[in-house]
Amino acid sequence: MPYIDLNADLGEGFGIWQLGDDDAMLGIVTSANVACGFHAGEPAGLLRVCRAAAERGVRIGAQVGYRDLAGFGRRFIDVDPEDLVAEVVYQIGALQAIAQSCGSTVSYVKPHGALYNTIVTHRDQAAAVAEAVRMVDATLPVLGMTGSVFFQQATDLGLRTVAEAFADRAYRSDGQLVSRREHGAVLADAAAIAQRAVSMVASGKVTAVDGTQVPITMESICVHGDSPGAMQIATAVRDRLTAAGNEIRAFC
């Protein structure tokens, strides 16, 4: 039976400001991309998420980002590569301590937001993120976009790369994501998103906004926990994938 992992961004609240229903999403996904305090998240909240993930057997991933709480890590920052190495090392280390205190561990690393999109093509920042992961633990897989410069740099350093697809994001014809600033970048119809996920897994292709069929490889599918109707979307995606004969399990 083919398998696919489901991942979602969690732990992105800050104090009394909560974003999404982390507990509910942990009942659906198999991998949790947990914020590390730079783009979102605060220690007590991250501890709660990691504890809940550990109790449910959900893998914990360090979701590293730019130091940009005000912009939620969705703004490009022209950070010096050496500084970026240090900041990514810091974030992984912080979440690793929290995860270990809950009887779990950081199992992989996934960049967040603008950093994720930037290192698809930005060689210096891609190399910095890959080097930071290698410095912390060269056995940690990195989750990202197939064909990216980041994956090239990670492979050169001997890191395992795990390709993901986005069930609820629109794609350009070059295989990159449509910017969130553009209309239609984030999809909202749960049934259509679920069918799209099944089609991507079965065909290895995704339909871009211009109608182009873009080849895509994936071991994991991302469902966003902060979108309107996130729970309905994630549930529909999991149910449709399972009904189509796919086993839902973590990639690591």
Curated annotation (Swiss-Prot):
<comment type="similarity">
    <text>Belongs to the LamB/PxpA family.</text>
</comment>
<protein>
    <recommendedName>
        <fullName>5-oxoprolinase subunit A</fullName>
        <ecNumber>3.5.2.9</ecNumber>
    </recommendedName>
</protein>
<comment type="subunit">
    <text>Forms a complex composed of PxpA, PxpB and PxpC.</text>
</comment>
<keyword id="KW-0547">Nucleotide-binding</keyword>
<dbReference type="InterPro" id="IPR011330">
    <property type="entry name" value="Glyco_hydro/deAcase_b/a-brl"/>
</dbReference>
<keyword id="KW-0378">Hydrolase</keyword>
<dbReference type="GO" id="GO:0017168">
    <property type="term" value="F:5-oxoprolinase (ATP-hydrolyzing) activity"/>
</dbReference>
<keyword id="KW-0067">ATP-binding</keyword>
<dbReference type="Pfam" id="PF03746">
    <property type="entry name" value="LamB_YcsF"/>
</dbReference>
<dbReference type="GO" id="GO:0005524">
    <property type="term" value="F:ATP binding"/>
</dbReference>
<dbReference type="GO" id="GO:0005975">
    <property type="term" value="P:carbohydrate metabolic process"/>
</dbReference>
<dbReference type="InterPro" id="IPR005501">
    <property type="entry name" value="LamB/YcsF/PxpA-like"/>
</dbReference>
<comment type="function">
    <text>Catalyzes the cleavage of 5-oxoproline to form L-glutamate coupled to the hydrolysis of ATP to ADP and inorganic phosphate.</text>
</comment>
